[in-house]
């Protein structure tokens, strides 16, 4: 696809208006960001762009914030994460979980993905959502300290899913939190060099975080009085 608009004479505008392929996607992404920042309201043009991307079978769509492009994801998966973000935003005890999860999603699936940020924001989303449940009196709680709290006081926590006799109800939640925490390779540096998260691991981290945020904000994981 190529822009068929007569380009102005200056070199920058000429390159902009004659972009194609990946370059054109970058142009569209940048224009959407500019439009949102400048608060330009053009619903008709946005709908036309959405229709063009759909009809062309593009791997990208206009994101929910209308400020950029994002890679297409199965609608059911995207809608589940969107619902989790909306629900978390309505739970005061979840703090900034919704904002962190939304940022993580965009960093993982946006036109210019940032795996390190996506993973970091995923952890922050879970920390925000779980704080009031796991360590409500710890002002500087992290996912690491919360895992320590679970390990030291397992009997204090319950989950909505029935657990067979003799089984530990908090273990599945703990395992997901542990996987997310231990999987962050960029947290610390060392002599061998810091290893950044891959895009695949960052995207997996976002979905782990979405599930955990939903559990904590919905009351599926609770702390006994």
What residue spans do the PLM features occupy?
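General "foldedness" signal
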Residues: 42, 63, 118, 132-133, ...
């Amino acid at each position: 696809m190529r822009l068929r608009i007569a380009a102005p004479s200056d070199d920058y505008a000429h390159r902009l208006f004659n972009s194609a392929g990946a370059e054109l996607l970058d142009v569209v992404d940048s224009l959407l960001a500019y439009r949102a920042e400048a608060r330009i309201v053009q619903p008709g043009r946005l709908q036309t762009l959405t229709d063009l991307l759909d009809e062309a079978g593009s791997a990208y769509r206009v994101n929910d914030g209308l400020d950029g492009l994002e890679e297409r994801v199965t609608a059911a998966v995207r809608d589940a994460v969107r619902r989790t973000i909306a629900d978390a935003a309505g739970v005061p005890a979840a703090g900034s979980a919704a904002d962190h999860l939304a940022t993580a999603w965009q960093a993982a699936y946006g036109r210019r993905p940032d795996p390190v940020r996506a993973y970091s924001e995923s952890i922050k989303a879970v920390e925000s959502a779980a704080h009031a449940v796991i360590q409500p009196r710890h002002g500087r709680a992290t996912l690491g300290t919360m895992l320590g709290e679970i390990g030291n006081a397992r009997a204090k926590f319950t989950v909505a899913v029935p657990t067979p006799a003799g089984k530990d109800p908090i273990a599945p939640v703990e395992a997901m939190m542990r996987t997310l925490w231990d999987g962050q390779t960029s947290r610390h540096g060392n002599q061998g060099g810091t290893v950044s998260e891959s895009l695949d691991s960052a995207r997996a981290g976002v979905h782990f975080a979405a599930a955990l945020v939903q559990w904590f904000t919905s009351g599926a994981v609770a702390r006994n009085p």
